[in-house]
Amino acid sequence: MEYSVVIPAAGQGKRMRAGHNKQFIELGGKPILAHTLAVFEQDDWCTNVVIVANEQEIEEMGELANRYQISKAKKIVAGGRERQESVFAGLKALSQDGLVLIHDGARPFVTEKEIHSLVETAAKTHAAVLAVPVKDTIKRVEGEAVLETMPREELWAVQTPQAFDLALIKQAHQKAENEQMLGTDDASLMEWLGYSVAVVQGSYFNFKLTTPEDLLFAEAILAEKERR
């Protein structure tokens, strides 16, 4: 099986409080994004990587890809103000049919096994996401008051990559752009268009590095992986 992947890496990561794009923050001696790109570079099923960057960081992203020998990163395109705009820019850089994955640049711990399970499911269903059951009790809150406690057994935390038929997800993004609809993730656009989205159970290790605390966890995970 084959797939392409779009990696949005244009966000500034304000919650990381690093003062610059968190993709360039070092994790175990190399940028977070380099770890993420390496997963797809090493996967034989992946044929093409599109990186979506801030316009002023395109050259720096290219240098990063060259430095870490990411030969599949054939295109680096400028993103938009919102993540959704950036993803659509990446999708428009792909011309061939088939499956496309959309994966956060700041999720460096996704595994090839998880990717392959996702791709195999999406090949049958046209849309699939990685997700994990929530561990905590989730309450719906308004102001400082609890409105209701959500049934935890029904709740899953959705991750990336998310996998789609390329033509369908392009159609969903185009319709969303035309109607100024902003989804919470790419799968929500497919749902909005009327398609069902399959769920593939992922791993709690595949978390998004968003805060300084996440970076501490990531360093610990990387150190443990290197000891094995």
Swiss-Prot record:
What Gene Ontology biological process does one annotation of this record name? isopentenyl diphosphate biosynthetic process, methylerythritol 4-phosphate pathway
**Which Pfam family name is an example for this entry?**
IspD
What UniProt keywords are attached to this protein's entry? Isoprene biosynthesis, Nucleotidyltransferase, Transferase
List the residue(s) that the UniProt entry marks as the site Transition state stabilizer: 15, 22
Q: Where are the transmembrane segments?
A: none
Looking at its record, which EC class is this enzyme?
transferase
Keyword Transferase applies? yes
Q: Where is this site: Positions MEP for the nucleophilic attack?
A: 152, 208
> Which EC number(s) does the record attach to this protein?
2.7.7.60
The record's section on CDD domains has: CDP-ME_synthetase
Molecular functions (GO terms): 2-C-methyl-D-erythritol 4-phosphate cytidylyltransferase activity
SUPFAM superfamilies under this entry? Answer: Nucleotide-diphospho-sugar transferases
Q: Which reaction does it catalyse?
A: 2-C-methyl-D-erythritol 4-phosphate + CTP + H(+) = 4-CDP-2-C-methyl-D-erythritol + diphosphate
* Pathway linked to the protein: Isoprenoid biosynthesis; isopentenyl diphosphate biosynthesis via DXP pathway; isopentenyl diphosphate from 1-deoxy-D-xylulose 5-phosphate: step 2/6
Q: So what does this one do? A: Catalyzes the formation of 4-diphosphocytidyl-2-C-methyl-D-erythritol from CTP and 2-C-methyl-D-erythritol 4-phosphate (MEP).
Similarity remark? Belongs to the IspD/TarI cytidylyltransferase family. IspD subfamily.
User: What protein is this chain from?
Assistant: 2-C-methyl-D-erythritol 4-phosphate cytidylyltransferase
Q: What is the originating organism of this protein?
A: Halalkalibacterium halodurans (strain ATCC BAA-125 / DSM 18197 / FERM 7344 / JCM 9153 / C-125)
